[in-house]
Structures are given as structure tokens and as C-alpha cells.
Amino acid sequence: MAAAFASLPTFSVVNSSRFPRRRIGFSCSKKPLEVRCSSGNTRYTKQRGAFTSLKECAISLALSVGLMVSVPSIALPPNAHAVANPVIPDVSVLISGPPIKDPEALLRYALPIDNKAIREVQKPLEDITDSLKIAGVKALDSVERNVRQASRTLQQGKSIIVAGFAESKKDHGNEMIEKLEAGMQDMLKIVEDRKRDAVAPKQKEILKYVGGIEEDMVDGFPYEVPEEYRNMPLLKGRASVDMKVKIKDNPNIEDCVFRIVLDGYNAPVTAGNFVDLVERHFYDGMEIQRSDGFVVQTGDPEGPAEGFIDPSTEKTRTVPLEIMVTGEKTPFYGSTLEELGLYKAQVVIPFNAFGTMAMAREEFENDSGSSQVFWLLKESELTPSNSNILDGRYAVFGYVTDNEDFLADLKVGDVIESIQVVSGLENLANPSYKIAG
């Protein structure tokens, strides 16, 4: 493991001299997906306080934030060090509009489809989240309006939605529509019975049906990867993995399983590389190597190498920087959006959500990503709605969709017991692990 250390720079925070608290509103036992966090047999629901102070960490992410407004700054302690890979520079990239922060919503909007009818069903169902911000049972009246609007829109646009299904997925798509209709009726019964606590779980369920409908509109893989990367492991679609982490020195929680959805539609090379490494069990038994309140990071193997050594070449396998921009049909490779002069471009899968997953790389080598990955721990106050410091500079390729809040509990030295692909492995093309096996 690399041993050179470098100082981290000063960073800035908007509207706060401390990081705000982030509430966790669910138990970490998640039976429908068998995704859980546990402390023996005790179900654990917690409230996370302010982030921990920065500490020595495994690889360098220089979090210098150039924001668009005047803000107070917080200097890092003098002994905060990191090895020289990778670094996040201090140039911000503009995005427009208020950010969507829910990881599953981001994944739905990132699908390569163009069907206005299903998007108009999706929106009022997502708006239930805002309705639940109303105090008490009064929120239920707003929830009812959301659901009735979605139901009407579904009936009005059903023929357009059905016509949008890929031929091979029509049966499954129609099944998802039936489940969505039944789910919305269940939600109206919940509202009628004034069971506020049952709304959010049912919303999550019916939005999964919406996501299923939208995925059934994708007909194959929508573009060709550039020839120079075509023989690399490629994720041509999506895959889900479960990452089980053994948490040390925490009396409240012993282990946690994080569900991660990997988006190969928008980052096929990056996501394919990761799935291939997962199937090689590369990360099994590896420690968390950085956890400082901004990122959780791992992937630096033991020894002098800073990435995955391909046994067929005995060299580090690297992947290019891969950024999909809204309105483009294929990703940009090898250059940051800043280098391309696309300062106001919006990326399809942004660093908006707590638990955004991205590929780490060296500061001045865009195509140096290999096996080191990080998850962003970020409250919305860290960046104003029209400024994002990481989009277009690092390749996002997935989001933690279950138990993401518990990423903040991970510490250096906690152990990844295993990462397993639970769906979508059939979307991996050119898997090198099979050749190695």
C-alpha cells in the first residue's frame, strides 16, 4: 500500500460552521430486500450527529471547494494527511436547477428513455416526499391528491406507456403496470385509514414499479462504446450488489449490508470494471481506507500497487474517465468537462445523493482509475443548488439505495466482508474473471 503523504487544503461550507445533522427515519432491518444493519438481534434506528473530524486517511481527495457565494471556511488540522491518489481539485462545475437528491429518483431519470407519459406518473408519486413534510395527519390530504393525480395520469397515458415497452419486455411491463395500479389503491386505503407511518414504505414500493416500467422501455444497449475500450469488461445495463461490512468498535451496530445500484447505461466501462472486480472477490476482506466525514473510500490493495494488477498482463488495469452529459448519446472519455469547456453542462448521474459512488483517480491523470472507489457523504448545504464541485471531474457509476445513511458510521479499519452481485450480472460483457477462472 502506498505510503507517501500530502497535506489536504482548506475547504469551505455553506451556511454553517458545522455539518448539520442527518436523520435516519427507518430501521436498518430491511426484510423485503434482505438488506440490513444489525447489532445481534437488536433492530437499530439512530440519529447521526455532526460529522467526525478529519483524520489521516488512505488516499488523497483534496476537497478544496470553490463556491459561488461568500462563505465561512474551516481549516483542516495540521496533521490531516493522505497519500497522493486521488485528488479532487478546487474548480467547481455549474449545474442548473434544484438538485434531485434521492438516489432511486436519480436512477429513474438517468434511464435512456423518452416517454413523457410515465414521467408524468412518476412526478406526483415522488412529490409525496414533500407532502410528508407537512406536520401530522394533515399531510395525508396532500398525499391523497398526489396519488389521485398519478392514477388519473396513468389511465390517460397508459396506451402511450405500453407502446413504449421494448418488444421483449412487454409482458413484464404490463405486469408492472398492474402492480403500480394496485399499489396506488393500497396507498389510498392507507390514507383513508390515516396511517401516516405506512405512507413512505408504500411510496418506495410503488416507485419501484415505476422504475420497473421505465426499465422495460429500454431496448438493448443504446450505443457503441469507443473501439479502444470495447474489449474491456462492460456493464451494458444495470446491476445491483450487496456490500456487507463488519463494523468495529461500535456498540450499537455490528455489521451492515448496503445495496448499491450500478449504472452501466451511463458509465459502462467504469461500472463494468467494478463488477468484474467484484466477481474476482477483489474487495472481499479489504478494509475501509478512508472515512473523514466527506468520503468513505476503499480499493487500494496491499503492497506497492495502487490498483488492480491484471494477472494476464501483470500491469495495473486502468479505466478512462467516463462522463455522460445530458443531451449526449454517448459519454465523454478521457477529459473533464472543464477541459472540454462544458462549464454549464449537466451530467446524467450527478453527485447529488448521499452515498453517490464514484471512481477515484490521480489528480493529473484522468484515465488512472483502477480499483479505488469512494462514496460521497454530503449534506445538501455543502453546495448551493447551482454549483457542484465534483460533477464532470470524477466518474459516478452508481448509488447506495439502501442503508446509505450508515455509510457515515464506517471507519478506517472496518472490513468489507463481501460484495456480491445480486442482479444484472448477465449485463456484464467481456468478463475477465471468467478468463482468469
From Swiss-Prot:
PROSITE patterns in UniProt: CSA_PPIASE_2 (PS50072)
Transit peptide: 1-36, 37-92
CDD domains: cyclophilin_TLP40_like
Broad EC category: isomerase
Any GO BP: photosystem II stabilization
Disruption phenotype: Stunted growth and hypersensitivity to high light.
Catalytic activity: [protein]-peptidylproline (omega=180) = [protein]-peptidylproline (omega=0)
Domain annotation PPIase cyclophilin-type: ranges: 245-437
Cross-referenced Gene3D superfamilies: Cyclophilin-like, Oxygen-evolving enhancer protein 3 (PsbQ), four-helix up-down bundle
GO molecular-function term, one example from the UniProt record: peptidyl-prolyl cis-trans isomerase activity
Role, per record: Required for the assembly and stabilization of PSII, but has no PPIases activity.
Protein name: Peptidyl-prolyl cis-trans isomerase CYP38, chloroplastic
Organism: Arabidopsis thaliana
